[in-house]
UniProtKB/Swiss-Prot annotation:
Disulfide bridges in this chain: none
PANTHER family (UniProt xref): COCE_NOND FAMILY, PUTATIVE (AFU_ORTHOLOGUE AFUA_7G00600)-RELATED (PTHR43056:SF10), PEPTIDASE S9 PROLYL OLIGOPEPTIDASE (PTHR43056)
Name of the molecule in the record: Xaa-Pro dipeptidyl-peptidase
GO biological process: proteolysis
Top-rank taxon: Bacteria
Family listed: Belongs to the peptidase S15 family.
EC number: 3.4.14.11
Active site: 349, 469, 499
Known role: Removes N-terminal dipeptides sequentially from polypeptides having unsubstituted N-termini provided that the penultimate residue is proline.
Listed Gene3D superfamilies: 1.10.246.70, alpha/beta hydrolase, Galactose-binding domain-like
Top-tier EC class: hydrolase
């Protein structure tokens, strides 16, 4: 374990003592450090009446148990304080470490010892993570140090888990959204599932907008998958025109109806553990799936602002600007009189994407979004540079396939019977609008691009994203982060994992950072907590995070690609083509081992390089036919230890999100030996070489010169590392699989790689 502590708010001794006493710690009148520490430990071991036994089970140093130390005439030193602190945090002397000084340095132990201000040291210790991934104070609360009294208790600017999760209110309401997404002449009602603790005060909300949460239709999804075995189209040269457009909203009727309590409850929901963490700390949890999902009205419009409006309506209801009904009969209203109107949104992938969209509406009441692995432009999710480009691991998926998956109204046979004809009519329109024939940008995709509306964001923004995420690729967060106005407080956690959550990792106090932030923004707690702009996981060292100011730089380092000319063939034998088409992973294995149709260029580095942003390939090439595509990957090549892209379990169910509530595993990205690591990649249609809004002709055997931007990255390379560039045509994981006979010819002398260098 290595500490990367960003959530602790520096606290002086006087404030620290007051906070400790408010929790129930008792201290002697004496200001002697040793007596203060003993009093702290007496309270810490609250579950046992035999304090001496508990204290004697610790050691003060490798020759003295802790009880003997307290009985002896020896002062409390930094070494003894550190030794005891480590044991409280779950480290075992003699097994986890043998040399105290070396170990505290190795793990970057963050707690300072100050014998003249021991209250500050103890306070910091309680605000430090246990080996099990929980703050020491949270570990104490988990064991019952403070009972669940449904009252806010704060420590170091964070709310504690003192809300009773065994007596939660679980209710369902139907919020009226000012849209008619299926054109049935009625405003759409949206099902909202609410979990909230009992409280005498109005409380804030953590909302997850998840089109998956009411169920998914995998059978319909699989039937809708598109074949990737198709020719690359030859497109006529033309310019593409799009316009920013706003959706039409309805004026909802203000009917004279009674106001009542909700009349529908539920027993279980597949919750998100970060939400559970906040639920036990006094935040309501809301799960909503939006239009076109089970028990809601409308059509699944998939990614546009009509869908976003169905989630925005929930925030409006929480602030008294929209109506909610007890049922689809629309006979009685329900008020959110328990809500203080302040909302944060959470969730990964599609869920985080809805957070992005919501933020760009500027809706009042949305204070923070925590958008993890989120899409900012749906075109960049299903297309790239004029090409069909399936998200990593899902060849054949497209937006209409996602519609089939998430239109969970189809899971209710009676509802689907009534909606089927209209649904397929709208779905067919969607399938035409996505234009798989050309792969080009169009108005449909522009309506699902949140970047032009980033200027409207007013809430605080938190992103997390994996630099090995080839599902929702890094460009999604890169573009959104850099598009936000300067007035917006924004933060980005960049890790080296794939499409994964990171809130339960040992190396970073993510949950605690979010706790401090939401206390500021949703509960109005004044604190000095400041989250850095960017927290980046260093790829060269295990469990090391560091703060940065920007993602992307204008500084560049140019690497010429070589001398002479090189050819890349597109066509494979029928046997090889079929094998790659059936299993794209076999293609990737052959590509990385030099067995595919490819050009491989290696560049040993004679200096350290810190990549930060978009690598650009400047290419001079010809195609033997009047079309073509090019794919590229940038690799850190060579056998060495690197961070894996999937977190492994360090310990099972040790992280308690409340008081024995919603336990989850402690995880971390492992450092393992590998032969290569993909730093970046990209694909491009030669007819779209100068941007998305222009389709150009390609003349056979005529030279083209263009810049090819790869996915952005933040990656550290060291002197002696080998940077590898792979150039090829068809990518069997992402692009259409065209096995026609053509080749690309590259002028290496006129081509180069431009690296963004911090």
């Amino acid at each position: 374990m290595r500490y990367n502590q960003f959530s602790y708010i520096k606290t002086d001794g006087q404030v620290a003592k007051k906070e400790l006493e408010n929790l129930g710690f008792h201290f002697p009148i004496s200001n002697k450090p040793k007596e203060i520490f003993r009093s702290f430990l007496n309270t810490y071991f609250f579950q046992s009446s035999d304090k001496d036994y508990q204290i004697a089970s610790f050691i003060a140093d490798f020759e003295t148990d802790l009880l003997s130390f307290f009985n002896a005439d020896k002062p409390l030193t930094k070494e003894i304080f550190d030794m005891v602190s480590l044991q409280l945090l779950g480290f075992i002397p003699g097994f986890d470490f043998e040399n105290l000084k070396e170990f505290t340095s190795q793990i970057a132990f963050p707690v300072p010892f100050n014998e003249n201000d021991l209250f500050a040291s103890i306070h910091h210790l309680l605000g430090t993570r246990h080996k099990n991934g929980m703050l020491l104070i949270d570990d104490l609360i988990s064991k019952g140090f403070l009972g669940p009294d449904n009252t806010y208790h704060f420590f170091n600017g964070k709310t504690l888990a003192t809300f009773d999760t065994s007596q939660l209110i679980k209710e369902v309401v139907y919020v009226e959204a000012p849209i008619d997404s299926d054109n049935d002449g009625k405003s759409d009602l949206i099902k909202v599932m609410i979990l909230r603790p009992r409280s005498q005060k109005q409380i804030p909300t953590v909302m997850t907008a998840s089109p998956y949460h009411q169920g998914i239709n995998e059978v319909a999804n699989d039937k809708k998958l598109h074949s990737m075995q198709t020719d690359l189209p030859l497109k006529e040269a033309h310019k593409i025109h799009v316009a920013d457009a706003s959706i039409s909203t309805l004026v909802c009727e203000n009917a004279d109806l009674p106001i009542t309590e909700n009349t529908e409850q539920f027993s279980y929901i597949d919750s998100y553990t970060l939400n559970d963490y906040f639920l036990s700390r006094g935040f309501a949890n809301i799960y909503v799936s939006g239009v076109g999902t089970a028990d809601s009205d409308g059509f699944m419009t998939s990614g546009d602002y009509v869908q976003i409006e169905s989630f925005k309506a929930i925030i409006d209801w929480l602030n008294g600007r929209a109506k909610a009904f007890t049922s689809h009969k629309r006979e009685a209203y329900v008020l959110a009189n328990w809500s203080n109107g302040k909302v944060a949104t959470t969730g990964k992938s599609y869920l985080g994407t809805m957070s992005n969209g919501l933020a760009t509406t500027g809706v009042e009441g949305l204070e923070v979004i925590i958008a993890e692995a989120a899409i900012s432009s749906w075109y960049d999710y299903y297309r790239e540079n004029g090409l069909i480009c399936s998200p990593g691991g899902y060849p054949g998926e497209d937006l209409d396939v996602l519609t089939e998956l998430t239109y969970s109204r189809s899971l209710h046979a009676g509802d689907f019977l009534r909606q089927k004809e209209k649904y397929y009519q709208l779905l067919n329109q969607q399938s035409q609008a996505i234009d798989r024939d050309s792969g080009d940008y169009n108005q449909f995709w522009h309506d699902r691009n949140y970047l032009p509306n980033a200027k409207n964001v007013t809430c605080e923004v938190v992103f997390t994203h994996g630099l090995q995420d080839w599902n929702v690729k890094p460009r999604q967060v890169y573009n959104m982060f850099n598009a936000l106005p300067g007035s917006v407080a924004k933060h980005l956690f960049l890790h080296h994992g794939q499409h994964v959550y990171m809130h339960n990792w040992q190396s970073i106090d993510f949950k605690e950072c979010m706790n401090a932030l939401l206390c500021q923004k949703l509960l109005g707690i004044a604190s000095n907590f400041q989250l850095p702009a960017i927290l980046w996981q260093n790829n060269q060292e295990e469990q090391k995070w560091q703060s940065l100011e920007e993602f992307g730089t204008s500084n560049t380092f140019r690497i010429p690609l070589g001398e002479g000319f090189a050819k890349i063939s597109n066509q494979y034998s029928t046997e090889t083509f079929e094998r790659y088409s059936k299993d794209f992973k076999s293609f990737k294995r052959d590509l990385f081992s030099g067995k595919a149709n490819q050009l491989s260029l290696e560049f040993p580095l004679d200096q350290d390089l810190q990549l930060n942003g978009e690598a650009i390939l400047h290419l001079s090439l010809t195609s033997s036919v009047s079309k073509g595509l090019i794919s590229a990957q940038l690799l850190d090549k060579g056998l060495k230890k690197r961070l894996g892209d999937t977190p492994t379990i360090l310990d099972l169910k040790v992280m308690d999100n409340g008081q024995n509530f919603s336990r989850e595993d402690l995880k971390e990205l492992p450092m393992r030996e590998s032969t290569e690591r993909v730093i970046s990649k990209g694909v491009l249609n030669l007819q779209n070489r100068d941007g998305l809004l222009e389709v150009q002709s390609v003349e056979a055997d005529q030279w083209l010169s263009f810049d090819f931007k790869l996915q952005p990255s933040l990656y550290q390379l060291r002197k002696g590392d080998c940077l590898q560039v792979l150039l090829y045509t068809t990518d069997f994981e992402h692009t259409v699989r065209d096995n026609s006979d053509y080749e690309l010819r590259i002028n290496l002398e006129k081509s180069y790689l431009s690296l963004p260098i911090a």
